[in-house]
Amino acid sequence: MLVEVLLNTPAQLSLPLYLPDDETFASFYPGENPSLLAAIQSAVHQSHGSYIYFWSREGGGRSHLLHAACAELSQKGEAVGYVPLDKRAYFVPEVLDGMEQLALVCIDNIECIAGDEQWEMAMFNLYNRIVETGRTRLLITGDRPPRQLNLGLPDLASRLDWGQIYKLQPLSDDEKLQALQLRAKLRGFELPEDVGRFLLKRLDREMRTLFMTLDQLDRASITAQRKLTIPFVKEILSL
């Protein structure tokens, strides 16, 4: 999925970001987060501005939900922006200029700008412009609650603490298995329960790692024309 983020530069360039097209609301397994999922979906479908901040210590689907929100609106022809602040070395704070004109702005990993005066001020100014226009949906993620971000700009910390704040609860092992089986089903193949539990036992349980491994196994299964079994998985992953 291509999402175009407008850059307010002298050349009026745009920064195209390719987001995973398999990270949608349909492929997100909510676990104990149905309220957060419902809040984001409601915000996306509203015609007026709103603000949601959600956080988790270990990732656990934060980026997935932002990608899903972008996909939902971009498919309707709406202008959206996604800014991964863990990759801010590739762009400048001015990337935020003018984003209040977009239907949706997603800011990922805001903890990464803590202590960076220019980025903090740019984010503070964007927040204020979005509030003034009242049209843009703003979704922000972090690895901790807003008040614990160690930001150098107190007013930004205060702004981020307004609105709806959620903790993204981590999935249990049983929920991770169901999330893997959902992803497999959407890709058109079956992940047997014993194979899924084997993966959870032998691999890093971080969901991004598990999904990447599932993709690898899917490709290997297609190439070898074999179903997913524990012996086949051991062979492919050298376990």
Swiss-Prot record:
Database matches in Pfam families: Bac_DnaA, Hda_lid
GO biological process: DNA replication initiation; negative regulation of DNA-templated DNA replication initiation
Record-annotated membrane-spanning stretches: none
Keywords: DNA replication, DNA replication inhibitor
InterPro entries: Chromosome_initiator_DnaA-like, DnaA_dom, Hda, Hda_Enterobact, Hda_lid, P-loop_NTPase
Coiled-coil regions, chain positions: none
Role of this protein: Mediates the interaction of DNA replication initiator protein DnaA with DNA polymerase subunit beta sliding clamp (dnaN). Stimulates hydrolysis of ATP-DnaA to ADP-DnaA, rendering DnaA inactive for reinitiation, a process called regulatory inhibition of DnaA or RIDA.
Complex formation: The active form seems to be an ADP-bound monomer. Forms the RIDA complex (regulatory inactivation of DnaA) of ATP-DnaA, ADP-Hda and the DNA-loaded beta sliding clamp (dnaN).
Family statement drawn from the similarity comment of this UniProt entry: Belongs to the DnaA family. HdA subfamily.
Protein name: DnaA regulatory inactivator Hda
Record organism: Yersinia enterocolitica serotype O:8 / biotype 1B (strain NCTC 13174 / 8081)
